[in-house]
Swiss-Prot record:
Name this polypeptide is given: Urease subunit alpha
Amino-acid positions noted as binding Ni(2+) 1 in the UniProt annotation, renumbered to this chain: 139, 141, 222, 365
Taxonomic placement: Bacteria, Pseudomonadati, Pseudomonadota, Betaproteobacteria, Burkholderiales
Alphabetized UniProt keyword annotations: Cytoplasm, Hydrolase, Metal-binding, Nickel
Subunit-structure text: Heterotrimer of UreA (gamma), UreB (beta) and UreC (alpha) subunits. Three heterotrimers associate to form the active enzyme.
Catalysed reactions, as listed in the record: urea + 2 H2O + H(+) = hydrogencarbonate + 2 NH4(+)
The keyword Phosphoprotein is assigned to this record: no
Record gene name: ureC
EC number: 3.5.1.5
Mod. after translation: Carboxylation allows a single lysine to coordinate two nickel ions.
Pfam assignment, any one: Amidohydro_1
Chain sites annotated for binding Ni(2+) 2: 222, 251, 277
Reported cofactor(s): Ni cation
Modification N6-carboxylysine occurs at: 222
């Protein structure tokens, strides 16, 4: 039987079992765990499109119609990187969803085919490329709509948060307050090739105004200290969430005016709640908000300006905070408020807590102490930094960093999906889910995607000069594709709403074009449900020195002096 060398095979069909791939210029190596394209019984039945290749009539392309089982699109020979595995496979898409993950081809002439290619099937060649689920950014200040294009170009396909534009309240808080603003933001969502979901204002001591917002269509509620996150507001907001199966996100009381972290934990009362920027630089009980990392009902996340900890982190934060929270540097109390939130000890511990799987999610805090286009990038920078500083994780072999990579990819994909009740639609590459996929060339992994697929349609891509004779000539930059225009846009993206809002008929009442998907199964979520990131240590934070201990171990790390995924990727 004819054979081919491993290097030649990888160059033609992409890596297979046992091959390793470096992620961009990081020190992270992944190894292919399984190859689903071998379901034909071994090598030799791979599919590939092009002149002289196998996806041709009567070969790997069958005569079957769509009604007879042919899929709409196949991503061939993709290296899937997801929380559940790192595998080589063909991916079949149909009706905007992932229809199958396995072996594509023509079942009339090939064995082991579970994805049928027909005359009506489009091909996206992924040989040598990595495919991840679209990222989810769960901490968005909707300050300007241009954030959405920036986020999409970085690999984010779902944005959750609140706001009404460049209003003072939105500069500081992720809340879309009241039915009128909620209706307007849901109508605006129809214009963007992005899954969107909005949080209402949760700061109230009586329930009626919160129920009103849930019924208007918000997918959850936000408690923010700038609106007064008191124990009574916390308890009332969670009562409404329990009654409506929605999530609550909390930014607690930095100044400890209405109580300390113990009082907030008591007011939450064991109920599920998302804790944003859990380290505290972004806000929360000073200096010990990190205590909540040890609570099983708190679902902790970080925002990206403190991640990873570098020699520049502390210097930029005070000025950034003053602007975001409408503070005046000429007022001593305002300056003290800002400085109380910036602590190098807790920022250093944050990196380590991520590596331990104790902080479960990444997000941006867009334009409000965070960078909307750097969620994915900073996540992988942190993984790289922790490998250099802490070494291999015990779950990883000497050959690869597969477990660490799965832990970190889960932080911006499946875990925010689970936490916010949207995991039935997005957050992973699994059959039945919305086909939001990001294709990366390995050399650019985590920093610059190659192609972005929304609901089965290409919505954005790194595209060359439109007047060139081929697609590749410079300048290559991110350009919207057909999935970002016209009726295709509305059919390729979702808007997440409450069950109550969907039942109230807001789609028709507001005249919405996008498909509305109701959040669900939220109120029983616990930290142990968050994939690869469910560690709940006993947390201790020294009120004088700010030293952080988890299960008795001091957590600290040095600031990075240099990082991957930086200047060499941004020369132009």
């Amino acid at each position: 039987m004819a054979t081919i060398g491993r290097r030649a095979y990888a160059e033609i069909f992409g890596p297979t079992v046992g091959d390793r791939v470096r992620l961009a210029d990081t020190d992270l190596l992944i190894e292919v765990e399984a190859d689903y394209t071998l379901r034909a019984g071994g090598y030799g039945e791979e599919v590939k499109f092009g002149g002289g290749k196998t996806i041709r009539d009567g070969m790997a392309q069958s005569q079957r119609t769509r009604a007879q089982g042919a899929v709409d699109t196949v991503l061939t020979n993709a290296l899937i990187l997801d929380h559940w595995g790192i595998v080589k496979a063909d991916i079949g898409l149909k009706d905007g969803r992932i229809a199958a993950i396995g072996k594509a081809g023509n079942p009339d002439v090939q064995p082991g085919v579970d994805i049928v290619i027909g005359p009506g099937t489009e091909i996206i060649s992924c040989e040598g490329n990595i495919v991840t689920a679209g990222g989810i950014d769960s901490h968005i200040h909707f300050i300007c709509p241009q954030q959405i294009e920036e986020a999409l170009a970085s690999g984010i396909t779902t944005m959750l948060g609140g706001g009404t534009g460049p209003a003072t309240g939105t500069f500081a808080t992720t809340a879309t307050p009241g039915p009128w603003h909620i209706e307007r933001m849901l109508q605006a969502a129809d214009a963007f090739p992005m899954n969107l979901g909005f949080l209402g204002k949760g700061n109230a001591s009586l329930p009626d105004a919160l129920h009103e917002q849930i019924e208007a269509g918000v997918m959850g509620l936000k408690l923010h200290e700038d609106w007064g996150t008191t124990p009574s507001a916390i308890s009332n907001c969670l009562d409404v969430a329990d009654a409506t199966d929605t999530q609550v996100a909390i930014h607690s009381d930095t100044l400890n005016e209405s109580g300390f972290v113990e009082n907030t934990i008591a007011a939450v009362g064991g109920r599920s709640i998302c804790a944003f920027h859990t380290e505290g630089a972004g806000g929360g009980h000073a200096p010990d908000i990190l205590r909540v990392v040890g609570e099983e009902n708190f679902l902790p996340s970080s925002t990206n300006p403190t991640m990873p900890y570098t020699v520049n982190t502390l210097d930029e934060h005070v000025d950034m905070l003053m602007v975001c929270h409408h503070l005046d540097a000429g007022i001593a109390e305002d300056l003290a408020f800002a400085e109380s939130r910036i602590r190098k000890e807790t920022i250093a511990a944050e990196d380590v807590l991520h590596d331990l799987g104790a902080i479960s999610m990444f997000s941006s805090d867009s334009q409000a102490m965070g960078r909307v286009g750097e969620v994915v990038l900073r996540c992988w920078q942190t993984a790289h930094k922790m490998k250099l500083q802490r070494g291999k994780l015990p779950e990883d072999s000497e050959r690869n960093d597969n477990f660490r990579v799965k832990r970190y990819v889960a932080k911006y994909t499946i875990n925010p999906a689970i936490s916010h009740g949207i995991a039935h639609e997005v957050g992973s590459i699994e059959v039945g889910k919305w086909a939001d996929l990001v294709i990366w060339k390995p050399a650019f992994f985590g920093v610059k995607p190659f192609t972005l697929i929304k609901g089965g349609t290409i919505a954005m891509a790194a595209m060359g000069d439109p007047n060139a004779s081929i697609p590749t000539p410079q300048p290559v930059h991110y350009r919207p594709m057909f999935g970002s225009y016209g009726g295709s846009l509305a059919r390729s993206s979702l808007t997440f709403v409450s069950q109550a809002g969907l039942a109230a008929g807001i789609k028709e009442r507001y005249g919405l074009a996008k498909h509305l998907s109701a959040v669900k199964n939220i109120r029983n979520v616990r930290k142990k449900d968050l994939v690869h990131n469910g560690y709940t240590p006993k947390m201790e934070i020294d009120a004088q020195t700010y030293a952080v201990r988890a299960d008795g171990h001091l957590l600290t790390c040095d600031p990075a002096v240099q990082l991957p995924l930086t200047q060499r990727y941004f020369l132009f």
